[in-house]
A protein has these predicted regions:
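Short, Gly/Pro- and small/polar-rich lid/capping loops
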Residues: 1-45
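Conserved beta-strand/loop scaffold segments within soluble protein domains that form the structured core
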Residues: 20, 24, 31-32, 36, ...
């Protein structure tokens, strides 16, 4: 871990038009079907390559509803800075564990989403994280705020090519679900088998709110992944559906945690794990 590079610069600035993305980066994401998915079934897409966002776009009709979907650096320095600073690293603090502390020190990239009160985003937003450099770490930060009575489905995808040296993924996800709001957070992680995946995810749910986690974990050499829901308001609810597959040479420790912090809260956990060839 001492040799992990904490920042690898992309060879391009972030683009809002897919045609402007450099060909070698575009080719990687096109093989994964990202542009096609954006055209047919997504309200917005963010694409991160190593430590930086290389593409970010949201449909005009979604933006006109007041939905904010932008990269974290722009959110922290632009007109949404006060909102971001109020929530940034408040659910996951640097004191939680050493990888949260590392994340807080070196984070880069990630997405910021805000859904205004009463707005329902009918089709999903997606961010895709590609770690392409050998011996590098990826430390993106995702911050989502779904205001009172609003709803959103957010999809996170992660992958990396295989190298003979270790890579590290120590991202952070903070989700705020307002009163009577609903958020579904879906993750597919198919890292290569040289990856150490030590991601921290946490949601805070207010009165009558719902958080739904959907998780598929299929790659990496080592994964430790336990999304946490803090049910902070009366009647708040958490649902977790997850599947994990560990093959030869893989050690995947996955599950979820729920803190029932208010009356009449409820949680449902449905997980399945498959081991093959000693995984």
């Amino acid at each position: 871990m001492d040799n992990i590079a904490t920042y690898v610069r992309a060879n391009t600035k972030m683009k809002g038009n897919w045609s402007e993305v450099p060909e070698e980066i575009k080719d990687t994401f096109e093989k994964l079907g990202i542009p096609q998915a954006e055209r047919t079934s997504l309200a917005g897409v963010g694409a991160q390559y190593d430590s930086e966002l290389v593409y970010h776009n949201v449909r005009k009709e979604v933006a006109e509803q007041g939905v904010i979907y932008t990269d974290m650096e722009s959110a922290l320095t632009g007109e949404y800075a006060d909102m971001v600073k109020e929530h940034f690293m408040k659910l996951v603090t640097p004191h939680d564990h050493k990888f949260a502390a590392l994340h807080g020190a070196v984070w880069s990239g990630g997405s910021f989403v805000y859904v205004p009160k009463g707005v329902s985003v009918e089709i999903p937003l997606q961010s895709y994280f590609r770690l392409n450099a050998a011996g590098a770490g990826q430390f993106e930060h995702t911050l989502i705020i779904v205001d009172e009575g609003a709803s959103l489905h957010f999809i996170e995808g992660c992958s990396a090519p295989k190298y003979n040296v270790a890579n590290l993924h120590a991202g952070c996800v903070e989700l705020y679900v307002g009163k009577n709001a609903k958020l579904r957070y879906s993750t597919i992680e198919n890292w290569s088998k040289n990856m150490y995946n030590l991601n921290t995810k946490r949601a805070k749910v207010e009165e009558g709110g719902v958080i739904e986690w959907v998780s598929g974990s299929f790659g990496s050499h080592v994964s430790y992944l336990y999304p946490m829901s803090v049910l902070n308001g009366e009647g708040a609810r958490s649902e977790f559906t997850g599947i994990t597959f560990a093959g030869k040479g893989q050690n995947l420790d996955t599950g979820c945690k729920v803190v029932h912090n208010a009356p009449k809260t409820s949680s449902y956990v449905n997980t399945r794990s498959i081991s093959k060839d000693g995984g």
